[in-house]
Amino acid sequence: MIALIQRVSEANVVVDGETIGEIDKGLLVLLGVEREDDLAKMEKLATKVMSYRVFSDDNGKMNLNLEQAGGSLLVVSQFTLAADTGRGLRPSFSGAGTPEQARELYQAFVDFCLSKGVNTQTGEFAADMKVSLVNDGPVTFNLQV
């Protein structure tokens, strides 16, 4: 399971001209599901995302996690993160989870974050989305479990 996280000062997702999710300070999480992923990996990754210390403390050091910084999550499904780009000029998605598996784990990720009290907004699974963000830093990390 892969989470490409970006520290943002604001981000939103638009589907069919309508804003369906938006946050101010927080993390934009692009979430990719691989064939071998399960609920245990989802929980481990969600915990890591929420606990990862990427927000600056009073000394300017990246030392605060999402809760400590008073941030929110915007979680967007992104199956292309599971692409194999090692050969040729076209990505292969043979390692990506099935749509059913990905939908289940994406929703479980969102539900887990909500259950921990994190303000969590979402995109729409498998929709054509327009994602806008203001990357703060920029600060971007690729987390994988």
UniProtKB/Swiss-Prot annotation:
A motif (Gly-cisPro motif, important for rejection of L-amino acids) lies at residues 137-138. The keyword Amino-acid biosynthesis does not apply. It is found in: Cytoplasm. Its EC number is 3.1.1.96. Gene3D superfamilies: D-tyrosyl-tRNA(Tyr) deacylase (3.50.80.10). One of its GO terms (cellular component) is cytoplasm. It catalyses: glycyl-tRNA(Ala) + H2O = tRNA(Ala) + glycine + H(+); a D-aminoacyl-tRNA + H2O = a tRNA + a D-alpha-amino acid + H(+). Its main location: cytoplasm. GO terms for molecular function: D-tyrosyl-tRNA(Tyr) deacylase activity; Gly-tRNA(Ala) deacylase activity; Ser(Gly)-tRNA(Ala) hydrolase activity; tRNA binding. The keyword RNA-binding applies. Keywords: Cytoplasm, Hydrolase, RNA-binding, tRNA-binding. It holds the Pfam family Tyr_Deacylase. SUPFAM superfamilies: DTD-like (SSF69500). GO terms for biological process: D-amino acid catabolic process. Homodimer. Belongs to the DTD family. An aminoacyl-tRNA editing enzyme that deacylates mischarged D-aminoacyl-tRNAs. Also deacylates mischarged glycyl-tRNA(Ala), protecting cells against glycine mischarging by AlaRS. Acts via tRNA-based rather than protein-based catalysis; rejects L-amino acids rather than detecting D-amino acids in the active site. By recycling D-aminoacyl-tRNA to D-amino acids and free tRNA molecules, this enzyme counteracts the toxicity associated with the formation of D-aminoacyl-tRNA entities in vivo and helps enforce protein L-homochirality. A Gly-cisPro motif from one monomer fits into the active site of the other monomer to allow specific chiral rejection of L-amino acids. This is D-aminoacyl-tRNA deacylase. The gene is dtd.
